[in-house]
Amino acid sequence: MANPKAKMSKSRRDKRRAQFNARTKAATTVVCPNCGEPTLPHRACRHCGHYRGRAVVTKSANS
């Protein structure tokens, strides 16, 4: 029976497990309170550029 040659660190083990979880779980979205578009939590809104009630990204008129 095969045995591991060296101990796998917790960091390497968790990196491998994270890849599986990233592929199988759908991304969580929240509704932007400023524009109402779905956006990723803890990120600035990609549509209006607001985060936590402030404009943190300036959006140009043609984008």
Swiss-Prot record:
Region (Disordered): 1-22
Alphabetical GO biological process terms: translation
GO cellular component: large ribosomal subunit
Record carries keyword Ribosomal protein: yes
MF annotations from Gene Ontology: structural constituent of ribosome
Family (UniProt): Belongs to the bacterial ribosomal protein bL32 family.
Protein name (Swiss-Prot/TrEMBL): Large ribosomal subunit protein bL32
The encoding gene: rpmF
